[in-house]
Amino acid sequence: MINEYVARKVALKDMQPCAICSKPSTTVLYNASGPDWLYTCEIHLQDNPQFVIPLYSTEYNEAVAQLKLVKGKMDSLTSAQTQLGSWDGWVTKIFSKKEKETNNSKDPDPTTTDSTDTSPQAKNDAEILSETKKQYSKILDKVTELQRKNRKYELAKIMFESRLLRKRTEQVNRERYLKEQENYSNTDPEELLRKHVFPSVPK
């Protein structure tokens, strides 16, 4: 039996106790390779690795990888913006201005020149950061939607092994019952009479 279950919904009239909390549930995990099924509440399928682990699609995994890349880019841009506006950034900027003033003493307005050099870059970085945040939000929405739509799960190792043991026990009991029925049907009626003969009344 393959450890792959699909979450399905059944009608209210078919609901059965949850395998975890015993409350009535309409959600059933079905394994076609068994076949095997067990009822569970929706809440137990969310962030519960001791019970089930979601089996996400390739599209979901690609979206998560893309989300991590965009998050890293966004963090680096945010860090650069923070450093530019921090005390250390301003101190560095002041010292660089003083160096330019001493080196270019003939320049009538060095501050204006410096501001025109740095301001477009800062503006460009802010625009890139804004676009990156929009991209991150869009990918995050996609990941959340794919996570919500996921219906495939695998049981935790201990849980799956207990299901396998239960299936084997049921199979052994079924085979034993069939064998007993076959032996009973193949028995000679006269032999049955001899085995189950009642004691006669003493003479």
UniProtKB/Swiss-Prot annotation:
A Pfam family per the record: Vfa1
Protein origin, superkingdom: Eukaryota
Basic and acidic residues: bias regions: 99-109, 171-182
Region called Disordered, residue ranges: 99-125, 171-193
Coiled coil location: 121-157
CC annotations in GO: cytoplasm; endosome
Gene Ontology BP, a term: protein transport
Bias kind Low complexity: ranges: 110-120
Compartments in which it is found: Cytoplasm; Endosome
UniProt entry keywords in alphabetical sequence: Coiled coil, Cytoplasm, Endosome, Protein transport, Transport
Main location: cytoplasm
Single GO molecular function: ATPase activator activity
Function field: VPS4-associated protein involved in trafficking to the vacuole.
Subunit structure comment from the entry: Interacts with VPS4.
Note: Present with 967 molecules/cell in log phase SD medium.
Protein name: VPS4-associated protein 1
Organism: Saccharomyces cerevisiae (strain ATCC 204508 / S288c) (Baker's yeast)
